[in-house]
């Protein structure tokens, strides 16, 4: 049920996130093709918000043709039960009935001249296959790209909002700061978003938090269940858990344009509760370096017989 909410959520925000769980076959299928877009005037937050509203209206009216036209062909949606493509979302929403949706804390961040990301909190009312949508707010993110002069949804992800857990007690067995020499030079990043993300996790596994910080843009944003973090908050957050045994899999990359790409993947952290999360990062080219601008984590849902709740679009 939680999934429906997400679905709804996404529709409004980016109407964009869908890839039926298809394994790793097309893991980098979109990363190697050049992206071109017609010149377009700089899009405003009002423009993108209006696009979100149009998407939600299309869902309420069950106008699936309009809804589909507002999504890019390589649209990807990340939910707590998997990653969905455009075809998967179009099939999913046909069982969705939306009666009301409310948004709060909308904020647009520019990725580059041809891509933006809209973040917000969303709560929806309605049904999915006759069952009421779950109550509660979701932290959502929806990315839009300029394709041939049109702004289309390309990515959506939402995470059920929850109160932050109490901080873990300090461990005497582990150093409180980076165990890597400050003289060591961080590995270089490039246009390969998957490779970049692996470099970041290598820094985390070695507790080199200075290196981790060097991979983030000054205005980096992170969305987790307990809220939205800035760069300082992200650096502080990663120092509170042991990433040394993290296992990464199910990689998928989507190229927004020549200066920005999305990578999404599954993280398993033995000993954590929950021990699996779906992570996504948007990498951008800034002043000759590839840096992480945006990151979101969504805990994987417990397996249930018939789960229908977050926004699976």
Q: What role is predicted for each listed range?
A:
Residues 19-73, 154, 162-218, 304-312:
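Short, low-complexity N-terminal intrinsically disordered segments enriched in polar/charged residues
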Residues 71, 81-82, 107, 112, ...:
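A mature extracytoplasmic/lumenal domain signature
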Residues 68-104, 213-249:
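Short solvent-exposed beta->alpha transition segments
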